[in-house]
Amino acid sequence: MIQPQTRLNVADNSGARELMCIRIIGASNRRYAHIGDIIVAVIKEALPSTSLERSEVVRAVIVRTCKELKCDDGIIIRYDDNAAVVIDQEGNPKGTRVFGAIAHELRELSFTKIVSLAPEVL
């Protein structure tokens, strides 16, 4: 469960390394965001000489959370970290690679571009 002020790892090669959640998109009074939700975040740590800089406000979609995720077939999935992929206004990823496993719920939420870049879909 991601709430404002939560720090997340970045699971792509967009240039950002760490994000901090500011707001959950599409929810005026929702407290937590889950896998597949879009958030507004600020970049807390970035690689030098990349297009994204520190303290820049970006949109990101959550791909992994430490909170357990119950699937329809009864399987419970829990990841080791909270991670997100930086996206643009149209929902396309800014990076060209995605690191680590992502949840299959992203395919159902029409983030097919992110799913196709991921090495493993759980």
From Swiss-Prot:
Quote the subcellular location field of this record.
Plastid, Chloroplast
Question: What's a Pfam family this protein contains?
Answer: Ribosomal_L14
Output the Gene Ontology terms for molecular function. Answer: large ribosomal subunit rRNA binding; structural constituent of ribosome
Name the Gene Ontology biological process terms: translation
Tell me the keywords, alphabetical order: Chloroplast, Plastid, Ribonucleoprotein, Ribosomal protein, RNA-binding, rRNA-binding
Q: Name one GO cellular component term.
A: cytosolic large ribosomal subunit
Q: Which PROSITE patterns match?
A: RIBOSOMAL_L14 (PS00049)
SUPFAM superfamilies the record matches: Ribosomal protein L14 (SSF50193)
What is this protein's function per UniProt? Binds to 23S rRNA.
Q: Which HAMAP family match?
A: Ribosomal_uL14
Subunit structure as annotated in this protein's UniProt entry: Part of the 50S ribosomal subunit.
What this protein is called in its record is Large ribosomal subunit protein uL14c
Protein encoded by which gene? rpl14
